[in-house]
Amino acid sequence: MASAAAGEAEETTRLRKPRFSFEENQILIREVRAHYPQLYGAQSRRVSVAERRRVWDGIAAKINGITSWKRTGQEVQKRWNDFKRRTKEKLARVPHSTQGAGPAAEDAFSAEEETIFAILGPGVAAPGAGAGAEEPPAAPSSQPPPPSACPQRYVLSEDRREDRRADTSAHSKAGSSSPEPWARPSCTPQEGGCPRPKERESPPPSALQPVQLPRLALSPPPPAPPLPPPPPLAQVAPSPPSPPPPPRPPPTLSASDPSLDFLRAQQETANAIRELAGTLRQGLAKLSEALSALLPLLPGTPVDSLPPPLPPPPPPPPPPRPVLPPPAPKVEITPEPVSVVAAVVDGAVVAARGVIIAPRSEEGAPRPPPAPLPPHDSPPHKRRKGFPTRKRRGRWKSP
């Protein structure tokens, strides 16, 4: 039972890989420094995700060359992100730890952290940097890092100092050929202080050749185009001389302004149109005079040059109004009910109710009304025995 538990514990411990050793950290920092432009620098925007993953896999392959276990590119990238995050957090705590009392040895920076500072550049030296954020490299600056963080970077042990010397001597060539100007090894402890970082090396400025721009002088206004001479007209009859065209205003010398040029062109166009209208008017007058002189010379034409105008035609008479026949008297004929008994007495129709209806005469002359009948003792409405006694419904009216 105990052996089984020991086997499970051993199997469990095998699942976790050992921590990164000092040599692995040095290889990781060196390779990231060499490929920093592709991973986080100016070229990272043009590098695809697959290419960036291949770069991390190459770094992991170099680390696996000195170890017996194998690390993947994701593990190597995570180790670098942890390195960077912890370094930024420690740098953010430095100004606060130096203001109060207490030992500052707990915030001492290691050789790896110093190298990470050199890789990330002076942009991460500001306090309050975000933890774990993937920030692009900051622009090179000539300002020195905070003075409070400078003395504490060198609270290192003797073995760290030796490793630091070996690391700086090994990577001096890599630092000289680094693509970024600020990616070079930091100051050494033998210098006795943190010197100011060297400013960005730039090539000596070439002799600036002054470029003289030619002064543009104002061009004079364009001269007005000469007016074309009017076409010659054959004079058939003498005509009075035409009035001379109005004199043109003298051109005023002013600065070359596009608005003035436009107004001047408009004025010239208006003058040309006015002169053309006068020329056409004169030509029409001469043509009418020539026609009036030629019409009497034609055979079969009266002496008068022009016939008198015809009188306007008289307006048409209004249409006759239709004659309407005289209105006939309206005669309303009311149908008598079936139950009314009528009798003919002396040619007159006498209803049972005592109403006398005069018959129509053939000649159209009305007859005199007959004498009224004597009153009857029997009631006027007498129901015959042959009529049915049922009730009438619908549109029939009862008598």
Swiss-Prot record:
Residues 12-84 form the Myb-like domain. One of its GO terms (biological process) is negative regulation of transcription by RNA polymerase II. Its main location: nucleus. Keywords: DNA-binding, Nucleus, Repressor, Transcription, Transcription regulation. Residues 137-149, 219-252, 305-329, 366-377 have a biased composition (Pro residues). Residues 87-108, 127-261, 297-332, 358-399 are annotated as: Disordered. InterPro entries: Myb-related_repressor, Myb_DNA-bind_5, SANT/Myb. One of its GO terms (cellular component) is nucleus. A motif (Nuclear localization signal) lies at residues 83-86, 382-385, 390-393. GO terms for molecular function: DNA-binding transcription factor activity, RNA polymerase II-specific; DNA-binding transcription repressor activity, RNA polymerase II-specific; identical protein binding; RNA polymerase II cis-regulatory region sequence-specific DNA binding. Signal peptide: none annotated. Residues 127-136 have a biased composition (Low complexity). Interacts with PFN1. Homodimer and heterodimer with PFN1. The proline-rich region is required for PFN1 interaction. This is Myb-related transcription factor, partner of profilin.
